[in-house]
A protein has these predicted regions:
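Helix-coil boundary/capping segments in enzymes
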Residues: 1-237
Length: 237
């Protein structure tokens, strides 16, 4: 009920919210070896999301349709559909893109038709915590997408979300996505912020090792184009 949700926003003193899928961010990993199935699944998901919530209900509830770049033609077509229905924000997972030809960097130039349209439209792309396909290499039970049992205690699998976000954003900078599309706006949601210190250190180190590779300072490029939602317990000093 959209209006009931607006009432809750009013009770909490919130002007507007972004609305993300809880389980929808898990399924691309399960289907990644079948790009056609990925497209069919998320086209259906996005139609349901728009029907139930809308993409900009009263300019207060901004539901985020989910996008995969597994088929860039599909992604561009789906983006046009979402933009035509008022989408302000879209959701992707922080992971390599699994295409019919194998995995690719999300900043590969083969995906430029999608990124170009995103930049032109001015919508925000959210890299939301998801099943990004990371493994604990035997230190803990994997299979995030297929198991919803509670954790008995801490293990290294807890760092997978941060590892995925770190690698995703490093790749966007390394592959010069923001240099090609200076109007892009990307947000990191539910990935925390503790990975930032190490990311900035590595970006500076890489710039020194590969002198002349970057047109812009990589750390400043990140700061200009990426907004990060920290966990409440993160030390952001």
């Amino acid at each position: 009920n959209r209006d009931a949700r607006l009432q809750v926003l009013d009770e909490h003193g919130l002007e507007a919210v972004w609305l993300f899928p809880t389980l929808g961010v898990l399924y691309e990993e399960l289907l990644k070896h079948d790009p056609e199935a990925v497209g069919i699944t998320f086209r259906a998901f996005n139609r349901w999301l728009e029907e139930d919530w809308g993409f900009a209900y009263r300019d207060r509830i901004f539901a985020a349709p989910y996008f995969s770049l597994a088929d860039v033609g599909w992604a561009v077509e789906e983006l046009e559909w979402a933009l035509g229905r008022g989408a302000h924000v879209i959701c992707i997972r922080p992971a390599a893109v699994w295409t019919a030809k194998g995995p690719r960097s999300p900043a590969s130039t083969e995906f430029d038709p999608f990124w170009a349209r995103v930049a032109e439209a001015g919508v925000t792309v959210v890299a939301h915590a998801a099943d990004s396909g990371y493994t604990s290499h035997g230190y803990a039970d994997d299979g995030f997408s297929s198991s919803f049992e509670g954790f008995a205690g801490p293990n290294v699998k807890l760092f997978n979300i941060e590892r995925a976000a770190h690698d995703f954003f490093a790749t966007l900078v390394f592959d010069k996505l923001f240099e090609r599309f200076p109007n892009l706006r990307v947000a990191s949601v539910e990935n925390g912020s503790e990975f930032l210190g190490d990311l900035f250190k590595k970006l500076r180190s890489t710039a020194n090792k590969y002198a002349g590779w970057f047109r812009d300072d990589p750390v400043e490029s990140f700061r200009e184009h990426v907004w990060v939602n920290p966990f409440w317990e993160d030390d952001v000093r």
